[in-house]
From Swiss-Prot:
SUPFAM superfamilies: ACP-like. Pfam families: PP-binding. The lineage of its organism: Bacteria, Pseudomonadati, Pseudomonadota, Alphaproteobacteria, Hyphomicrobiales. Keywords: Phosphopantetheine, Phosphoprotein. The keyword Nucleotide-binding does not apply. Transmembrane segments: none annotated. It comes from the Bacteria. The keyword Nucleus does not apply. The modification O-(pantetheine 4'-phosphoryl)serine is found at S42. Residues 6-84 form the Carrier domain. This is Aminoacyl carrier protein 2. 4'-phosphopantetheine is transferred from CoA to a specific serine of the apo-form of this carrier protein. One of its GO terms (molecular function) is acyl carrier activity. Gene3D superfamilies: ACP-like (1.10.1200.10).
Length: 89
């Protein structure tokens, strides 16, 4: 895995763990973990989206805000790498 992708994945994992902790959810999170399966609510997903935007200094386009893109750390990593690569934000 490329260094940029590893860095993005680590940062996303950190943000996800922070949101889970704030929502009193104790779970072991891995890149393929389905966030809804570990207990993240729809409000938690909104909080996660806002924190991801802040962490990566991005404004996610409406078309990227989909359940598929926030399904797992790996899915968010792909979306963020695409956004960083496109120069959007």
């Amino acid at each position: 895995m490329h260094n940029t992708a590893i860095n993005v994945q680590n940062r996303v994992l950190s943000v996800v763990r922070s949101v889970l902790q704030q929502n009193a959810i104790s779970a072991d999170v891995h890149p393929e973990s389905r966030l809804v399966d570990i207990g993240l609510s729809s409000m938690g997903m909104v909080e996660l989206m806002l924190k991801v935007e802040a962490e990566f200094d991005l404004i996610l386009p409406q078309f990227e805000i989909t359940p598929e893109n926030f399904r797992s750390v790996k899915a968010m990593e792909r979306m963020i790498l695409n956004q960083l690569g496109s120069g959007s934000g």
